[in-house]
Amino acid sequence: MSNSRSVLAFDYGTKSIGVAIGQELTGTANPLAALKAKDGIPNWDDIGKILKEWQPDLVVVGLPLNLEGGELESITPRAKKFANRIHGRFGCVVELHDERLSTVEAKAELFEHGGYRALSKGNIDSQSAVVILESWFERQYG
């Protein structure tokens, strides 16, 4: 497996979907603008534009789990469906990755660098996507 692939990550939510892009070579990720969702349904044209612009080799979707590692009845199946739709609509290779505590970590990082003003919903969601993606890199390569 090449370690110079580009990877796009999504932090799925019912109102907002965080987005980040990263490189396996460096193991780092950067936030992109969060996408709006209406009751969990994104604008698929916006997803398509992001995929066309960044042309990732892989897409990682955060998998919401409870602290014990079990599925959350209200959101986990929807995140899985979102991942399956990305694969089905766009033919992307998609992996799910445990996103436990990613929002907590994202808020802490944003607050550290920008105080309360940095804690907007879109910033938090895309920073969560960064945390998910960097955690995925860490799991792959230690």
From Swiss-Prot:
One of its GO terms (cellular component) is cytosol. It is found in: Cytoplasm. Keywords: Cytoplasm, Hydrolase, Nuclease, Ribosome biogenesis. Its main location: cytoplasm. It holds the Pfam family RuvX. The keyword Transit peptide does not apply. CDD domains: YqgF. InterPro entries: RNaseH-like_sf (IPR012337), YqgF (IPR005227), YqgF/RNaseH-like_dom (IPR006641), YqgF/RNaseH-like_dom_sf (IPR037027). One of its GO terms (biological process) is rRNA 5'-end processing. GO terms for molecular function: nuclease activity. Disulfide bonds: none annotated. It is an enzyme of class 3 (hydrolase). Its EC number is 3.1.-.-. NCBIfam families: RNAse_H_YqgF. Belongs to the YqgF nuclease family. PANTHER family: POLYNUCLEOTIDYL TRANSFERASE, RIBONUCLEASE H-LIKE SUPERFAMILY PROTEIN. Could be a nuclease involved in processing of the 5'-end of pre-16S rRNA. This is Putative pre-16S rRNA nuclease. It comes from Photobacterium profundum (strain SS9).
